Amino acid sequence: MGINLVRKLLHKGHEVVSFDTQPFDYPERDLVEHVMGDIREKDALALAMRGSDWVVHAAAALPLNSDEEIYSVDIDGTRNVIEAAVSLGIKRFVHISSTAVYGVPKIGGMKEDSPLVGVGPYGKAKIEAEGIVAGFRDKVAATVIRPKSFIGPERLGVFSLLYDWASLGLHFPIPGHGNNLYQYLDVEDLCDAIYLALTCESSIANDTYNVGAREFGSFRSDFQAVLDRAGFGKKVRGFPVGPVLGILRLLDKLGWSPLYPWVYETAVKDSFVSIDRAVEKLKWSPQFSNSEALIRNYDWYVSHKADFSAQSGTTHRVPWKQGALGVAKIFFR
C-alpha cells in the first residue's frame, strides 16, 4: 500500500518521507526522502518523523511471519510509532489496522462496534495495536482504518496464487460452492480514505472506520471475473468444504502452504463490513467494485510478471511461495 499512498500524496503536492525496512526502488525515488529502518528502532523512527505534520502507520508483520515477529512489530512497533508521533507534536495520525480483528464472521455486515475476535497472532496483535492507538486519542487526532483485503497495482501476496493460475490457463479450486458474499477493496480507494482522514476535522478523524468495496459479488463470481479476463475459458471449481479445509489446515500446520487460518476459514463465509460510517462522516465514496479491483490487479500482474518471476517472500510486494498448492496445478489444466 505504501507506494500507492506515496504517489497520491505527491500528486496532492505534499512532501513525503518514507520509512521502511526495504529500499525505496520505485521511479519516484528522487521525489521522496527515504529512510531505511525498523519501527522497533526508536531513534531511527523519531529521526525520520521529525518535522512532519502527519504520520500514516502501515507497517506490520504479516501472518506468514513467526508469532514473535508479529507481536514485536505489530504491537511494540505500533507503540513506538505513536509515542514518537505524540512526542514530536504530530498533528494527525492514521493507523492501518485490518478487518481481521472481527475474526471468522458468523454474519456479514460487521460495524465498527461489533465484537473483536482475533484469529491467530496477527488478528490478536491488530486488536492490541488498535487499543494502544486509542489510548493516545487525547493527545493526537488518531484514525484507525480497518480495510478489507485490498488489491491493486504493486500489490500481490496471496492474490498472486489466483493471478498465476489464471495467467497459466488453469481452472481455480475453491472450498465449497462459492456463493458466499465476499468483499475486497481497491488500494486506490483505501488511499482516498486515508487522505480524507488526514484532512478532515480532527473530531471526525479521531475515530475508527471500516473500508471496503461498495459493490461486491460472491466469492465464486468475483474470482471467475479474473479467469474470464485471462481468456482461457477456465472456471472456478468448488470442492466439498470439509475435506478441503481439512487439507488446508494440515498443510498450514506443516508449513507447506502460504494460506493461513483467516484466509481459508473466511473463504466459505459471508465476509463483508458496513462502510456507512466512512461514507457518512469521512464523505468517502469507493470507486471500484470487487471485480473491477481484481481485474485491475490482474492486469498489473500480467504486465509486470517478468519483473518478479524469481521473487517470493512474506510481504504484499512480492508473490507468495505456493508450496504444496503449486503441485496441485497438474490437476487443473
Predicted regions and their residues:
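Flexible, glycine-rich beta-alpha linker
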Residues: 103, 143-161
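Substrate-positioning beta->alpha
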Residues: 80, 128, 155-161, 176-198, ...
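Conserved Rossmann-fold NAD(P)-dependent oxidoreductase catalytic core, especially the SDR/UDP-sugar
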Residues: 76, 80-122, 143
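NAD(P)H-binding glycine-rich loop region in Rossmannoid oxidoreductase-like domains
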Residues: 36-76, 84, 99-104
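Mid/C-terminal beta-alpha module of Rossmann-like enzyme folds, strongest
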Residues: 200-259, 275, 291, 295-296, ...
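N-terminal Rossmann/SDR dinucleotide-binding element
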Residues: 1-54, 58
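Active-site Tyr-X1-5-Lys
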Residues: 117-146
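Glycine-rich Rossmann NAD(P)(H)-binding loop
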Residues: 152, 174-180, 207-217, 227-231, ...
